[in-house]
């Protein structure tokens, strides 16, 4: 393989992980201090010099924000692999305004997002479901909305022949065993240990699909 595999990660603050504050090595793109960096480190060991990874995460973004910035952040770069993790802020909109997912056009926007990616590239599309931790306890009220978003994303991902990785139960099962503070500081964002679980799940699923093998 002579050309580098172009991989773009799209998402909200969980993907962003302060990527403009953690520039990495000289000459490398800013990847942040979250799961994107951990995935990049794993792939660098496996495929040294053969990947071009970019972090397209934006703090506070909903799926509508990703759709608005899609051409700039993703399509113009002609990626081989696109990974999407979105939904936490969409859940926040519902919980803070009383609007439903239908009223925010979540499914329509998510379908449009994946459709535009699929229309521009025949590469691999990886979708990850949102998650929330019931610590602090007030976030337990968010769980039904998070689960509804997860199922919506799962269905639409299947329509677009995308891999789908459900994260909510995966992360919460681990948190129940090892303690919530190990994985999250605020119930939404991940610690290094939490990001490691996401990175490992992403690598396992893409390995299963034979993407980097």
Model-derived regions: residue spans:
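Active-site segments of SGNH/GDSL-like serine hydrolases
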Residues: 85-91, 114-148
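Cell-envelope and extracellular/periplasmic
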Residues: 9, 13-14, 23, 56-61, ...
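Catalytic-core regions of hydrolytic enzymes
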Residues: 58-80, 97-109
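A short acidic, helix-capping loop that chelates divalent metal ions and anchors anionic groups
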Residues: 17-19, 64, 91-96, 134-138
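Catalytic His-Asp segment of secreted/periplasmic serine-dependent ester chemistry enzymes
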Residues: 131-213
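Short glycine-enriched, charge-decorated loop/helix-capping segments at active-site entrances
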Residues: 22-29, 96-103, 140-144, 183-185
């Amino acid at each position: 393989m002579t050309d580098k595999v172009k991989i773009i990660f799209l998402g909200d603050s969980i993907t962003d992980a302060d990527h403009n504050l953690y520039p990495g090595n000289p000459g490398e793109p800013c990847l942040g201090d979250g799961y994107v960096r951990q995935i990049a480190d794993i792939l660098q060991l496996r495929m040294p010099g053969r990947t071009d990874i970019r972090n397209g995460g934006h703090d506070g973004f909903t799926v509508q924000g990703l759709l608005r910035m899609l051409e700039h952040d993703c399509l113009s770069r002609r990626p081989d692999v696109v990974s999407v993790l979105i939904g936490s802020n969409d859940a926040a909109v519902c919980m803070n305004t009383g609007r439903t997912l239908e009223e925010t056009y979540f499914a329509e926007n998510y379908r449009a997002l994946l459709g535009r990616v699929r229309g521009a590239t025949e590469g691999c599309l990886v979708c990850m479901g949102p998650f929330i931790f019931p610590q602090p306890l007030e976030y337990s009220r968010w769980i039904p909305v998070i689960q509804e978003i997860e199922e919506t994303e799962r269905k639409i991902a299947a329509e677009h022949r995308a891999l789908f990785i459900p994260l909510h139960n995966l992360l919460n099962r681990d948190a129940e065993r090892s303690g919530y503070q190990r994985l999250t500081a605020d119930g939404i964002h991940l610690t290094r240990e939490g990001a490691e679980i996401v990175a490992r799940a992403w690598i396992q699923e893409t390995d299963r699909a034979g993407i980097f093998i």
